[in-house]
Regions:
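Vicinal oxygen chelate
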Residues: 2-10, 13-22, 40-42, 52-57, 72-100, 118-123, ...
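Core segments of cupin and vicinal oxygen chelate
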Residues: 19-61
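Short beta->alpha connector loops
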Residues: 45-46, 68-69, 89-90, 113-115
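Short beta-strand/turn micro-motifs at beta-sheet edges
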Residues: 3-6, 69-73
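Short, charged/polar, Gly/Pro-enriched secondary-structure boundary elements
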Residues: 58-63, 126-130
Length: 141
């Protein structure tokens, strides 16, 4: 039903994935190198927060990483809090997995074994997980 409402309204959504991090510069470097993202925006001391937005031109999503100087928020992701990227081209997937390791991500076993069948799960310094899945997303027409 929800998808019918979006179609009816012709809604074009842009997704921002906002996460607190313990080291803003380190998170920026890891995600830029690992996922080939670029800085698309940044701010300093915005009511006590510093932040950076990472993305790519033409994409319908971006990451926002923040750090509060006055009351740092500790990240508390679970093993099932995932960002999943579908990479159906095998060469692109292998290259991307290697790039994640070079950027400082650690490869871990997925909590849900489904993600290990055709993918690899990586964790960043704050415990956030990214899955690179060597498949097409089955629900996208």
């Amino acid at each position: 039903m929800t998808s019918d409402i979006f179609k009816e309204l012709n809604m074009q959504a842009h997704l921002r994935i906002a996460r607190p991090v313990s080291d803003l510069q380190f998170a920026k470097t890891m995600y830029c190198q690992g996922l080939q993202l670029s800085v698309i925006g940044a701010f300093e001391d915005h009511q006590g927060f510093d932040g950076v937005m990472l993305g790519r031109a033409g994409m319908q999503y971006h990451f926002e990483f923040t750090h509060c100087k006055t009351q740092p928020v500790r990240a508390q992701p679970t093993a099932e809090d995932l960002i999943v990227f579908y990479l159906p081209d095998n060469h692109e997937w292998i290259t991307s997995c290697a790039r994640m390791l070079t950027a400082g991500f650690q490869q871990v076993a997925a909590f849900n074994p489904y993600w290990d069948l055709k993918g690899r799960t990586f964790v960043d310094a704050d415990g956030y997980r990214v899955v690179l899945q060597n498949a097409r997303c089955a629900i996208i027409a």
